[in-house]
């Protein structure tokens, strides 16, 4: 995994089933039409929990308002945000934390950050990692070009990828890049306008297929035919559903050691040192992608990718996570029911 041999000039601007009712959408989604990772996690949990157990709790996803608190049920705060987020600052106060039966973190990295930066005690929370539906074992296509895929929002590194691919095209033509990226996934289609120049530049690249926002079902189908996750992230994430899903599908993840990607991707990914300068980042990324394309079909790497798929389809599956959620909530319900009715919280 060598650094890029190319001298790059950075050119792009730095610019499923169960329905959640309207009240839950208003409370837990950034937009009522949003279908990002937060919304998929909430819908996925409701789909798999015993309905009676679900109805005994009030779930709040990251953003808390006083009117969201239910005094008659245990309140679960399920965090997907960072501690630096303005919406998280209330957790500095013990009186605010006391409103929740449990604070659920999506990674150990996230819990540690909330402890160090906001003083959220470890005993107030629990880590239940994000997850995805299992992928059936499958073989990657061998009779065509290697397919790279990017399926996150435009502001999370797409500009770095565009610059890297532009220069990689001058060296080889044995790959294609499928890009599924738009703020429409959050119901914020207007935000795409600031990235139109970037989208136009992507349209100039012969190896790039730009699809915008599509359903998660479509993404999952595409992942079974893809080989490499091309995700030069420039956005600190507390967990990464993109990486989880791609690695469960057996893709080679080429990602930086940024935020919780180190925990999510572990040693299976081709991980490199993150660069703050976009031009340097693009240069480094072009080189690593070049090496990944050269190495993809090597027997040792193929064996690792098979082990990776087994690992992620087990440890990051909804089968495991739903069982963990059931255990947590069953215990919390028993504690809640044993309290005097006049004392439901603080917990």
Where in the sequence are the language-model features?
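Nucleotide-activated donor-binding/catalytic signature segment of Leloir-type glycosyltransferases, i.e.
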Residues: 192-214
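N-terminal pre-catalytic "stem/leader" segment of glycosyltransferase-like enzymes
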Residues: 1-66
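Donor nucleotide-sugar binding/catalytic pocket of nucleotide-sugar-dependent glycosyltransferases
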Residues: 101-115, 120-137
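Conserved donor-binding/catalytic core segment of Leloir-type glycosyltransferases
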Residues: 140-157, 162-165, 169, 178
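Acidic donor-binding loop of glycosyltransferase active sites
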Residues: 224-238, 251
